[in-house]
Amino acid sequence: MSRSGDRTSTFDPSHSDNLLHGLNLLWRKQLFCDVTLTAQGQQFHCHKAVLASCSQYFRSLFSSHPPLGGGVGGQDGLGAPKDQQQQQQPQQQPPQQQQPPPQEEPGTPSSSPDDKLLTSPRAINNLVLQGCSSIGLRLVLEYLYTANVTLSLDTVEEVLSVSKILHIPQVTKLCVQFLNDQISVQNYKQVCKIAALHGLEETKKLANKYLVEDVLLLNFEEMRALLDSLPPPVESELALFQMSVLWLEHDRETRMQYAPDLMKRLRFALIPAPELVERVQSVDFMRTDPVCQKLLLDAMNYHLMPFRQHCRQSLASRIRSNKKMLLLVGGLPPGPDRLPSNLVQYYDDEKKTWKILTIMPYNSAHHCVVEVENFLFVLGGEDQWNPNGKHSTNFVSRYDPRFNSWIQLPPMQERRASFYACRLDKHLYVIGGRNETGYLSSVECYNLDTNEWRYVSSLPQPLAAHAGAVHNGKIYISGGVHNGEYVPWLYCYDPVMDVWARKQDMNTKRAIHTLAVMNDRLYAIGGNHLKGFSHLDVMLVECYDPKGDQWNILQTPILEGRSGPGCAVLDDSIYLVGGYSWSMGAYKSSTICYCPEKGTWTELEGDVAEPLAGPACATVILPACVPYNK
C-alpha cells in the first residue's frame, strides 16, 4: 500500500493469477475467441490479445507493421493467413485476346484485378502456421493461458521449434532448462541432437560431457566402429576429430599407435579450411605422422579448388548419411506483385512437415535444379514475373549442403526460363525455354571439369514449358509450347552423336508438366492444354516405353490438376510439390506422390511455406543435424 495525499494505491498480488485463470476459462470454453490458428490440419481458437502479449511475432502481425523475420510466409517458416490465401488465389478469367501472346508463359495464370493483399493485418482471423507441429502449438498455447508447459523428451523439440518460430523466448528458456536438467547417460545422445539442431551451445556442452566419458572407456575396435557409424555420434566432423584426439590422449603411450588408422576414418574435407588450420593442424601428430600429414594436405587441397569440388568427391568429402531428402527451390507465389520466392525448403519425413533449409542468393521461378555429387545446381529462371520473359536470367549457382554455402558459376550463354536442365556424365545440358526474344531452340552444354559452356545441336523446333528426363544415356523432351501452340511431341537427344530424333507423340498435348523416370519407363504427369481459349488441367498420366517407342495411358489419373509443380523421384515414388490447378483456380502448397508399382496416389502431411507455381525439386543428402535457417 502507498499513500499520496488523500489517495491510496493498494496492490492485489492475486490479480494477475485471477486474470490468467479467467482467460484460461474463456479459452477452454471457447468464449470470445477472435483468431484461429491451424497447424498440421488441427485448429486452435484463441484470443489475439493473449497471443500478442506473449509473442513478438503475433504482436507485429496484429499491429500495423509486418511481422518480424520476413512477414507472413517469410523466413520464419509461417504460412500465409487463410484470408490472404483466399484473396490471392486468382480466378480464371476469359481471355480478352484472340490468341495467346507468343512469349507469354503458357498455362501460368495472370493476376486478376480483384487479387489484393490484405491492407490491414488486423483483419487476419485465420492463420495457417507452416513448420509448427500441432502438438508443439497446443503445449505452447497451454503455457500462454496457464504459465505451465508440459515437457518430455518426446515433445520438447516440437515445443522448442514452435517457441522459436513464434518468438516466445520464455518458452524457449523453459525448454533449455528442461533439457539441461534431464541430461543423463541414457539420453545424452538424443539431447545432443536436439541441442545441435537448435543451436543450444550450453546444452550441447553438457551433453557432450557424457559422450566423452563414455568414449574414453572404449577399446580400439569399439572406437574404430564408432567413427564408422551412421549417423555419427556428434554433429560435426570437427567434433568427431576432437573426440578422437581425447581418446588417443587419454592413454597416449598405448593408444597413439592407432592414430593413423583412426584418422583415415575421419572426413577432413567436411571441416572448413580455417578450422583445419586452427584446430586440426595444431595437433602434434597431424604434423609429424606421414599418414596424418597426407590426410590433412589432401583436405586443404580440396578446399583450394571450390569450383571443382563436385568433380573431386570421395568418401573423405561426403556427408555422413545415406538418406536422401526432398528439396523445394524457389517458385512463384500468388498475388499481384508476383515476386518469386528465394527459399530452399526440405521435407522432414519424421516430423511430417516442410522446413526452411536456406536462402538462395536471388529470387527465382521457372528455373531448373540439378543434383551433381550431392551439390545442388540452380540454373536460369526469372527473378521477376513477366509474361514476355523480360526478367529471364542466365544465372548459375551451386549450393553445398555440407557448409550451407553458395557460389556463383559461369552463367549460361543465353537467358532462359521454362526450360529443361539435366546432368549426363560429366556435363550439364540446358534445353530450350524462353526469354525476351521468344521461344528458344538452343541447347547449351556445361563441362563440369573445365567449368565452361558451349552450344550443341539445337532442338528441331523452339520449345518452352516442356518437360525432360534422362534415361539410358539419352535425354528425352516431351510436350511444351511451340509458338503459342501446345504440342504432344517427344524428342530424344543422343549426346555421343549430338543429334535429335523424333519419337512417338504423347496421346495428349500438354505443357508445364513433368517427366519422371522409374523402372525403365518415362511418366508424363500434370500440366495443362488449351481448348479454345480455356486452359484445362491434364488429368491423364501417360507412361512411355523407350524400347518399344510407345505411350500408354495409365488407369490412375492424377489426384488434382497441377501445372508447373516441382518434381523429383525419391525411393519408389514420384513427388509433385506445389503447382497451379486450373479447375480449382488456385496455387497449391501440398505435395502428392505417385507409386508406379502400386499404381496409387497419396498426399503428404504438411504444406510448403506458401502456395507456389514454377518451383523446382531435387533430392540430396543433408547432414544428420540440419539447423533451422536463422
Curated annotation (Swiss-Prot):
Alphabetized UniProt keyword annotations: Cytoplasm, Endoplasmic reticulum, Kelch repeat, Membrane, Repeat
Subcellular location(s) of the protein: Cytoplasm, Cytosol; Endoplasmic reticulum membrane
SMART domains assigned to the protein according to its UniProt record, in alphabetical order: BACK (SM00875), BTB (SM00225), Kelch (SM00612)
Family annotation (SUPFAM superfamilies): Kelch motif, POZ domain
Domain BTB: 33-153
Protein name as annotated: Kelch-like protein 14
Residue ranges of every copy of the BACK domain listed in the record: 212-281
Keyword set includes Manganese: no
Region called Disordered, residue ranges: 69-117
Self-association and partners: Interacts with TOR1A.
Record flagged with keyword rRNA-binding: no
Sequence ranges of the Kelch repeats: 325-374, 375-426, 427-473, 475-520, 522-572, 574-622
Major location (coarse): cytoplasm
Assigned GO CC terms: actin cytoskeleton; aggresome; cytosol; endoplasmic reticulum; endoplasmic reticulum membrane; neuron projection; neuronal cell body
